[in-house]
Each structure stands twice: as structure tokens, then as C-alpha cells.
Amino acid sequence: MSEHTLHYGDISWTMPVADKNLAAVLESNPVSLPVMEPDQAVREALRHPIGSPCLKDIVNPGEKICLLVPDVTRLWQSPAVYVHVMVEELNACGIPDSDILIVTATGTHRAHMGDEQARLLGEDICRRIRVIDHDCRDTAHLVHVGDTSRGTPVWFNSYAMACDKIIITCGVVYHFLAGFGGDLFEHGTLTSDNNPLVGIPLTDDCCLNIYAAAIRTFL
């Protein structure tokens, strides 16, 4: 008999497992990383990006900037660690707090409740920066940007689309329905209306529809 602890959000359970029922224990492989504080790592990544201009070469004073962040169901991506550094870097580029908008990419999830936004982004950021939850069912705040080649109408969050630049932040991981996460997935599913996902068989068509919707936005 052995005991194993399972973690779920802020909760964990320890359960006994009989040896005869234990097939294997899967553990993550150790990865050697540079010794660096999280803030420093984020700042270095922003100032020395791979295959992209630096933030200071992308944004300009006077522009409205939207930071698109995951919602509380993706808390493990630790946006509270990197968002405040991104805001500092934007400030250094001449973008004041008043010209920054944070939109949580909820997709079809519910809006945040209680202290969830503060847990997601940190209390200081929530005090300083306007934060709104995307609502895919609120048609009054969706804007039509065209149709995909597959005939799907594409609607995106009007608050985000009203900004001069949208900076997408998220983890790049596999999603069981839509393929690998990343910038197009975040923008294509999590700030749109219901249509990219409604009535589509759970096949490659779903993924293609999502990416087509996201790409359509940037054309």
C-alpha cells in the first residue's frame, strides 16, 4: 500500500493505493533552467524575443494597447507573474496605464467572480488597469470582421478590436478540441462569439475553422 497526493487548484487529496492496483507513477522529467527570478526572465524575453521585434519597436506612445490574457481556468499559466512586467515595459515605452486594457479570454466560460481577477493578475494591476471579461454571448460588444473561406461569420470582442495593438499572452499547450494553444488559438476562440465552435464535428475542421477566424482578423 502506498499513498499518493493529487492536486486540483488550491485543493489536494491524499489517497491510499494498493500495490496490486498501481500500474505506474508518472512524474515530470527534470529540466535544467538558468537561475533567474521570474520577473527577470519575463523582462529578458520581452527585450530579446525570438523571431520578433522588441516591444519598444512595436508599440508607440498615444496608442491604445490591449493585453489579452487567459482566464482563471488557466491560472497555472501564472499571468500574475508576467502581466505586471509587461505593463512596466509598456509604461517604459510611453504607454500609460490609462491607455492599456486587459481582456480576459474567457471563450465560452463564465465571467470571473469574487477575487478571481485579483488572483489571476494581482491586486495592483487590477487597481491600475481596466480589466474586462470577454462575453461571447454579449452581441452588443462583438464586431463582425468578415467570414472565413469556410463560410463562418467571424465576430470578435469590440473592446479589443478598438485598440491599436493587441498583445496576446498564453501558454502553448495541447487542447483536446482545438489543437495546440498559442496566439491564433487564444484570439480565434477566446475573444470571439460562439460560432467557431458551434455545429462543427470534433475533427480537424474545428481547428481549421478556429485558425481561419483568427487569421481573418489580422488580414
Q: For each of these PLM feature ranges, what is it?
A:
Residues P70-V81, T106-H112, G171-F176:
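Gly/Ser/Thr-rich loops at beta-strand to alpha-helix junctions
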Residues L75-I95:
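Histidine-anchored nucleotide/phosphate-binding helix
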Residues L184-L219:
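Extended, low-polarity segments enriched in aliphatic/aromatic residues
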Residues M1-E44:
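N-terminal amphipathic/basic leader segments beginning at the initiator methionine
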Residues T14-P16, A24-L26, W76-Q77, I168-T169, ...:
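Short helix/loop capping segments that flank catalytic or ligand/cofactor-binding pockets
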Residues A111-G181:
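An acidic, phosphate/nucleotide-engaging active-site surface
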Residues I50-C66, G94-D97:
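Glycine-rich phosphate/diphosphate-binding loops that line cofactor/substrate pockets in enzymes
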Residues D97-G107:
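Short internal beta-strands
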